[in-house]
Amino acid sequence: MDKQIGLQIHIRIINFPSTEAALPEGCENLASTTSPQMFNNFFKALTLLQQLLEEILEECRPNCLVADTAFPWATEVAGRFGIPRLIFHGTSYFAICAFLSKFHHEPYKNTVSDSEYFTVPGLPDHIQMTKLQQPSYFKGVDDEQKKLTDLSVQSEVTSYGVLVNSFNELEPAYSEHYRNVFGRKAWKVGPVSLCNKEIEEKSLRGKAASIDTYECLKWLDSKRPNSVLYISFGSKYRFPDAQLLEIAKGLEAAGQDFIWVIKNEDKQELLEEFEQRIAKDKKGLIIKGWAPQVLI
């Protein structure tokens, strides 16, 4: 559609340096990582994209560079070519503001235990969390992620501005807070998921779904509106057996209709009896692997 209205769009495909970063060939996104070491190697692979990007910029000479927050080196590269760099954030203003508040003030360091609540300072709302709920790099157990986080924050400070996957009606207080408190230029470009209109487009966002999309919709349509709980912990988290079983027990005890997305595709036997019971009662749907989240 953009080409039809006269925009000159050209797509350049480059090879992701999986093997150069000690990743299996074809491992090109976080959903394909299965261990903390693979996770760290994935971000090492991202740094190897710098030279490839510089070669493209040398050839194409664009007026601006838009790069995800996971590429902190992109600001320096853009500066080398004399063009502004805009950071793209796939998360909301609220998530960004909460993260930056914790990053700068480190309120979790004042807690006595991992389960003690602390207040995230300076936000428009009173938000409380525990140290257990924090990413590993905030807890000092992941040096590689800490380095990347520090570089990303510094890169955001020195970049020209930020594009955020949000819209004003969703969180006006936090869009203002981000600009006024953190002093960033920011533009709302969301929700970007609306670019996908057809069922097939929605079901294939990110990668192919591991469940038949029509089977999923048929199950959802059999339930009352607003009656189904959706549980997903993101593409990178895989739980130990004990936690998976506790979640399963909690869902079964609640008696709530649910869709549960599990990234542990290898846990078929562990939850086999649970799956049989919920399938018989038609209370739940378990998706192992990638879920058609936008479609759902």
What are the language-model segments listed below?
Residues M1-V294:
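Nucleotide-sugar-dependent glycosyltransferase catalytic domains
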